[in-house]
């Protein structure tokens, strides 16, 4: 998703209007997964969700451990499994499905996919990464992101 220069300038002007307290408030969050709104500037709250393999959203606000029940969502294969196909169209289809689910749950930002090369077998997040091959990782991540963004997320 490309952001034009006018949008950047508008955002910079908005940040300049914010007090230090308002800036701190949006960084600290309203809930574990939600930013605070700033009514004075008509800034709405933004909902973020973890989930490169499926949307993770709780019915209520989660506690600091995230122990509330999650809403039902599709669980897709790991990025490594998808990358084994070398099929960018498949990556984009999965991204579209994730984007549709995110939009249906009022999720504004999906925190994924993870893009990193697998440098060590000891990395506990390797399942989130597509491949140790930077070319394949980049192509698959781009297709995934195109799919997600095509649904407005």
Spans of features found by a protein language model:
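N-terminal beta-rich core of secreted/periplasmic extracellular enzymes
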Residues: 2-153
């Amino acid at each position: 998703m490309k952001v034009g220069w006018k949008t950047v300038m508008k955002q910079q002007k908005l940040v300049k209007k914010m007090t230090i307290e308002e800036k701190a408030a949006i960084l600290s969050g309203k809930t574990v997964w939600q930013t605070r709104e700033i009514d004075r500037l008509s800034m709405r709250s933004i909902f973020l969700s973890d989930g490169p393999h499926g949307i993770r959203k709780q019915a209520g606000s989660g506690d600091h451990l995230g122990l509330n029940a999650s809403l039902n969502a599709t669980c897709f294969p790991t990025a490594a499994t998808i990358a084994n196909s070398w099929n960018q169209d498949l990556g984009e289809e999965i991204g579209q499905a994730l984007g549709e689910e995110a939009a249906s749950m009022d999720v504004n930002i999906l925190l994924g996919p993870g893009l990193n090369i697998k440098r060590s077998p000891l990395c506990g997040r390797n399942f989130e990464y597509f491949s140790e091959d930077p070319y394949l990782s980049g192509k698959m991540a781009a297709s995934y992101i195109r799919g997600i963004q095509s649904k407005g997320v």
